[in-house]
Every structure is written in structure tokens, then in C-alpha cells.
């Protein structure tokens, strides 16, 4: 983080800064042009001039002061060296000059290394890549961890820099390292919603099943932080990208990772959550990028693809092999239907506890999927009515259906609450029955918590539909 106003150096995540504003670093501040000195200066004045030269990026003056005896590894406030400051603002020229003059690329302060600072720097990805590459070329260790056990690749992933991530892995960074909370680079990227970093990490062999200390996978972290694209991608069982470059040499890996299409990078950076954005992501996750142009030419959206029959696949030129990949992935994403006709007849009292629990689990899962579906619809609806391209029916029709949905969900909520009360009553009666011998599994309260969670989920779905209805009306005004 940076100190207040224009004062103080940037500190990588995991580092600490002082409360003092009198630190001598004036980032971006220039009240006068740097002046070259012709006569010997006192040490204190030389140090001040050195700081000004660093903050203004005056590499010529920096070299002149180094020639005059200033140490290249001078320690200023916070214990930072000039190289760490230059890395924090991704000033490539300064980093190069300081390294060429012998600056320590492996310097660390309170377990925070120069490489970590560079990976979390302020600046463009191109500048950060060059700084990181310079540091790695001077044997900076990409696997050293800070006090929070975060490594440089985690900082790069959290900052949204896929090429920096690839460069670090090419130089030996452990892609599945975990910090003190069990977060990996993939988890950090999922937390921040960096799609390009997610795709790059999967290609580099990141394990998407590693859990945090509280038992969350990257996909669950993405879902919790409202990143539906990332959640869908990481929820796929298949991972055709995994380990694609594991057999390449370091040089081949660097060339492959850094040779990216600038236009594509720009499009991905500014793309919104659109139907074709979903389609691109879905195909990329299955290794079917070659189908993207074909489907776009035929104006086939992801929603259309998900409902295709076999004859439609063939008609649109999708091979059997590709069909199998798509169908397998869709099977994982589809909501599991509850076949109510096959459920045991409760009235005959022949239903087993396991069967009834299975029913409740399926019902709860369905409600969760329905909530996610409505959230996605809310996200995709245009803000203003003039942005709707195709002709829609009267908005009153949609509002009417939403009202019916709200009514039905409220009814479902009431019935689930009645069911919960009934089960609670049965449970209380059994516990008070002196002839009843409780089973070991009944001692655990997790089943009753599941029922409560189901009731809360249904209630939440009702509230969500109400919000959906209000937002829908507002967007069509």
C-alpha cells in the first residue's frame, strides 16, 4: 500500500509501512528539475539528492551519485533499498541501472523481497514483466515466501498479471504453493476474478482442487465473490489445459507465454459478461478454441449450444469427439432433476432416513442452482430499454410471470417451514420417549442444520426473485 498523499513507497501485500509521513520518498513529486552537482556535497545532502533522483526517475543523476560514493544498497526509511523502491513503481530503467551497479536482487526486509515488490508493483504489465525478468536474471528466488507465506506468483496472480505468472513458473516458481490461509495463486486469481490468470494457471498445471484452511476450493471462492464465469470454468471436471507446457524447456516456455496476441488481450481485459464471453470461456476450458469462429459465424450462443440435439451438432459441423467433450462438460453443469415420481411414498411411512435426506439434499441443491440462474439473468439484462436489440413482448407479461414466481416461492417457503416444524416436533417426541434408544448418527446435529439451511435457501430465493422483479421493472422504465 502507499502512504498518504504523495509520500512513502508502495509496499507489497504482506509488508508494512510506517505511520510517519517524513520518509524522504516523494513519489511523483517534482518541485524543480534535478540539478547536477559540480562540487563535493555533504553526505546528508547527497542522500537527499539521491532520493529525489530516484523518485523523479533521473537515471543519469543516480549514476553520477553512485559514482560519487553513494551506496547502491543504501537503507532509507522502512529499511528499503533504492532497488526495492524502483521495483515498487516498475521503473525498468532504474531497476536495470541499479542491478548493473551491483544492487542486491535478493534483498528482503521483514521477509518481503524485491521480487515480491515487483510482482505487486504499480504499472503496466509490460513494465512489471521487464522488472521481474531483470530480477530473475540476477538469481532472485521465485519461491521465497513472506511472513504470510505468500510467494511472488501469488502476488502476480492477485494483481492480474498472467504473463508475469508464466514467467515465474518458467523460472521454477511452485505453481501450487499455499500461503498461511491455504490460498494458492489460483485461489487468489479466483478471489479477484482474473479470468486470464485462471486460464494461464490451469495451462501451467495449477491444481484447482486444493482447498484453503477453511475447506474452500478456488471455484467456491470465485462463487462466494460473485465471479460466475470463473466459477463455471473451475467447476468443470475436465481440465484439458492442465500441464500443457510441463514438457517444454525454460526458453520454450518463456517464448510461448510471452508471445500473446495484444488485441485478444485487450478484448479480454475490457469484455463484459456477455453470451459470447461465456462461449469463449466454455470452449477455452475444454480445449475447443478451434470451434469459436465456427460457432460465432453461425450465431450460436452458449445457451443454444447447451440445448443442442445430436442432429444439430452434426448439422453445424461439430465432430463426434468434440460433441463428447461438450456433453460431458454440460452434464457436470446441468442442474440435477429431482424425479418426484420415483420418490418413496411418505404416506406409507416406508421412506428411509437416507432416502428422505437425499430428497432434501437434492431440493437444496436445486434451490442453489436456481438462485445462481436468477443472479446471472439479473447481470445479463441491459440497464436501459433502448439497449435491447431484439423486439420483446410487453414488459407486463414478464412482470406478471415474476409475480407468479414470487408467489410460488413464498408458498414453497411456507411448506418447507411447515416440514421443518413437523420434523422438529417428531424429533422432540422421540427424544422425550423413554423407550427410544438414540442412534449414534442422531446425536450429530448436522442433519437438522441441513434442513434449516434448506429453509433459509428457499427464503433467500424468494427474496432474490423479489429483487429481480423490482430491478426488471426499473430497467424497463
UniProtKB/Swiss-Prot annotation:
InterPro entries: Ankyrin_rpt (IPR002110), Ankyrin_rpt-contain_sf (IPR036770), Asz1_SAM (IPR042650), SAM (IPR001660), SAM/pointed_sf (IPR013761). Residues 272-334 form the SAM domain. PANTHER family: ANKYRIN REPEAT, SAM AND BASIC LEUCINE ZIPPER DOMAIN-CONTAINING PROTEIN 1. Residues 1-24 are annotated as: Disordered. It is found in: Cytoplasm. GO terms for biological process: cell differentiation; male meiotic nuclear division; regulatory ncRNA-mediated gene silencing; spermatogenesis; transposable element silencing. SMART domains: ANK. Its main location: cytoplasm. This is Ankyrin repeat, SAM and basic leucine zipper domain-containing protein 1. Interacts with DDX4, PIWIL1, RANBP9 and TDRD1. SUPFAM superfamilies: Ankyrin repeat, Pseudo ankyrin repeat-like, SAM/Pointed domain. GO terms for cellular component: pi-body. The modification Phosphoserine is found at residues 17-18, 20. Keywords: ANK repeat, Cytoplasm, Developmental protein, Differentiation, Meiosis, Phosphoprotein, Repeat, RNA-mediated gene silencing, Spermatogenesis. ANK repeats lie at residues 45-74, 78-107, 110-144, 148-177, 181-210, 214-243. The gene is ASZ1. Plays a central role during spermatogenesis by repressing transposable elements and preventing their mobilization, which is essential for the germline integrity. Acts via the piRNA metabolic process, which mediates the repression of transposable elements during meiosis by forming complexes composed of piRNAs and Piwi proteins and governs the methylation and subsequent repression of transposons. Its association with pi-bodies suggests a participation in the primary piRNAs metabolic process.
